[in-house]
Regions:
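A charged N-terminal "starter" segment
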Residues: 1-144, 187-192, 222-228, 425-448
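Conserved, mostly hydrophobic/aromatic
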Residues: 37, 60, 82, 114, ...
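Active-site-proximal loop/turn and secondary-structure-junction residues that shape catalytic pockets
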Residues: 61-63, 84-85, 105-106, 126-128, ...
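Short acidic, glycine/serine/threonine-rich loops at helix termini
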Residues: 68, 91, 111-116, 133-136, ...
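Hydrophobic residues within beta-strands of alpha/beta enzymes
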Residues: 78-79, 99, 122, 196, ...
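Active-site loop/helix belt of alpha/beta enzymes
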Residues: 152-304, 414
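Charged (often Lys/Glu-rich) extended helix/loop segments that serve as interaction or gating elements
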Residues: 265, 271-273, 280-343, 362-448
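Glycine-biased, low-complexity coil/linker segments
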Residues: 352-357, 361
Length: 448
């Protein structure tokens, strides 16, 4: 479920007309719904009510401080993968004792910082990392709380770039080696064994891979509970969301279609609850995309329409530097017109355009939606049937709340877009748009 809907031919986020937000803050603009983020968090939290659990939001999905504050206030912990993410979470008011630190390449500085702040656990990805953390903690006269990330070698049925639980992936320690590594850890003076962690991938739309991984690791978890009195089992994140037809060009009931909607939160919990309940441990979850993916859109304006002998291109002001998912993964994002113009009056919309058939209700064209970046891979949609569009039209790239701005760059020396947050009938900036001066602010002339 999300809070984007059409009202009188205009797209709204909660109670805010998104066209007005675009006029106020410009485009490209990431616009997030606070209500959607909190609704998804509460649905998951309530579904797990009978289980001792902690939801640690995966900061990598969307690290905007306004989003982090929302989730902190709701009771979330945080899954962080860098010192920078820990810093962000703490600046948003997070409790370090509710933060877990993952990632295969933690640096000395990051480990020291996390120890100083008192994170709940380091998720250990290799024996080399275990030795390194023990060495650093010893030098600081501290004990580092750890959980091994165990790789169950389970096929997650997702994109190869976001599959993380197979034996050929770089993540975690093989299940068959884990017990021996735990035994080594138990003898290290600066290590405190706290739990077990797994994470098999992202954008997974079926329950079977999660259940298979849990059941595969469960015997090890039970053994470790007896031997080392571990506190928790973290099952990671990875539950997918709907990208295709995420608003179905105005349809209000896309989420009711089993064909277009992946696993629901309740279906996911119903599947994983039995094997987890039997373990009698605190369960950690690390959702990211699930909480914020459908809570955000990227607003962009059409600059030009270009036709060639083979193609019709709609060139927009957002580029692959703003949202790289289509170029990087071949990902699908629904793209819809913000205004369905039905009245010929120039007062019918903030843009002052009128006098044509409503976008989405008349003629359609097969088009490529592309950005201004100098790469053929700079596209948002290819051969997509879309309504008749023209220069100046405002479009919404749906389901852009996760892995959107956080993966943005200054490629082609393009300033980063702005971000804004909606709560009910209010919208406020949560990140200023970069200026061209910002592009060179940190550069210095070499002194030879």
């Amino acid at each position: 479920m999300h809070s984007f809907h059409y009202r009188d031919g205009r797209l709204f986020c909660e109670e805010v007309d998104v066209a007005i937000a675009a006029e106020k803050f410009g485009t490209p603009l990431y616009l997030y719904s606070a209500g959607t983020v909190l609704d998804h968090y509460r649905r998951l939290d309530e579904a797990l009510a009978g289980l001792d659990h902690l939801i640690c939001y995966a900061v990598k999905a969307n690290s905007n401080r306004a989003i982090l504050r929302l989730l902190r206030d709701a009771g979330a912990g945080f899954d962080i993968v860098s010192g920078g993410e820990l810093f962000r979470a703490l600046k948003a008011g997070a409790d370090a004792a509710k933060c877990t630190f993952a990632g295969v390449g933690k640096s000395c500085e990051e480990i020291e910082y996390a120890l100083e702040q008192g994170v709940y656990s380091f998720n250990i990805e290799s024996e080399a990392e275990l030795d390194y953390i023990n060495q650093i903690a010893s030098a600081k006269n501290q004990r580092a709380p750890i959980a091994l990330r165990v790789n169950p070698d389970v096929e997650a049925q997702t994109h190869q770039y976001i599959s993380t639980g197979k034996s050929e992936n770089k993540f975690g320690i093989a299940l068959e080696w884990a017990a021996k590594v735990y035994e080594r850890a138990s003898k290290m003076p600066a290590i405190s064994i706290r739990g077990v962690q797994m994470h098999i991938g992202s954008q997974i739309t079926e329950a079977a891979p999660f259940v298979a991984a849990i059941e595969k690791i469960a015997p090890l978890v039970s053994e470790l509970k007896i031997k080392y009195a571990i506190e928790f089992f973290s099952i990671g994140g990875g539950l997918g969301i709907a990208y295709e037809s995420s608003i179905a060009s105005g349809s209000g009931d896309w989420w009711k279609s089993q064909r277009s909607h992946p696993l629901t939160i309740q279906q996911y919990v119903d599947a994983i609850l039995p094997p987890l309940t039997r373990l009698g441990l605190r369960i950690l979850l690390e959702p990211g995309r699930l909480l914020v993916g459908n809570a955000g859109i990227l607003l962009t304006r059409v600059r030009y329409i270009k036709e060639t002998a083979q193609k019709k291109f709609v060139i927009i002001d957002a580029g692959m530097n703003d949202l790289i998912r289509p170029a990087l993964y071949g990902s699908y994002h629904e793209i819809v017109p913000v205004e369905k113009i039905t009245e010929p009056s120039p007062q019918s919309s903030p843009s002052g355009r009128g006098g044509r058939e409503a976008a989405g209700e008349g003629k359609t064209n097969k088009i490529d939606v592309v950005g201004p970046v100098c790469e053929s891979g700079d596209f948002f949609a290819q051969d997509r049937e879309m309504p008749e569009l023209r220069a100046g039209d405002l479009l919404a790239v749906m389901s852009a709340g996760a892995y959107g701005f956080v993966m943005a760059s200054n490629y082609n020396s393009r300033p980063l877009p702005a971000e804004a947050l909606v709560r009910g009938n209010k919208v406020a900036l949560s990140r200023k748009r970069q200026t061209i001066e910002d592009l060179i602010r940190d550069e210095v002339d070499p002194i030879w």
